[in-house]
């Protein structure tokens, strides 16, 4: 069997998580065990209401001890949240083993690395030593120095226009 591949969906445009979720639904529809792990989001996004009910689809609960965005946290809060993110990564690795996943989606993991909450080297080590049949999708603003050379696919979502630029808020059912 051919070794599974690594995908990165990055950029400042909308659609990274949407593309990753779309691929995960396709894989699940083919009978693949899927693990979805969201790193910097709470577990209230609308798609989770559907995904949690799919057979062979496993969601690793995100760390949600704060209502703040990371940029709003003080140094102590960032340190504590970073510990939770590292534990979340360990839980994700265990879920891959437990469910014999063939697809792993790590949503916003690249941003967790960029913010210093997760080691780029630890992520790259996992990618290099993952099971041969584990396809991996990672999302975030930009590939990291260690993940960039490991990726087979890198797709950049570019923002041309976004309602947020006009001060409009995210909408239930569309953005979350």
What feature does the model see in each segment?
Residues 4-94:
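Conserved P-loop
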């Amino acid at each position: 069997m051919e070794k599974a591949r690594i995908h990165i969906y990055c950029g400042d445009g909308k659609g990274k998580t949407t593309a990753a979720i779309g691929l995960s639904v396709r894989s699940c529809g083919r009978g693949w065990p899927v693990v979805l792990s969201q790193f910097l989001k709470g577990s209230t996004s609308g798609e989770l209401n559907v995904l949690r009910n799919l057979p062979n689809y496993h969601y690793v609960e995100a760390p949600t001890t704060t209502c703040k965005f990371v940029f709003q946290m003080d140094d102590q809060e960032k340190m504590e949240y970073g510990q939770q993110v590292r534990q979340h990564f360990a839980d994700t690795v265990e879920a891959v083993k437990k469910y014999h996943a063939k697809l792993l989606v790590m949503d916003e993991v690249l941003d967790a690395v960029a913010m210093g909450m997760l080691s780029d080297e630890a992520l790259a080590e996992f990618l290099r030593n993952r099971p041969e049949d584990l396809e991996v999708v990672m999302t975030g603003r930009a590939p990291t120095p260690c993940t960039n050379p490991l990726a087979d696919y890198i797709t950049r979502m570019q923002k041309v226009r976004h309602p947020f630029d006009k001060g409009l808020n995210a909408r239930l059912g569309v953005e979350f």
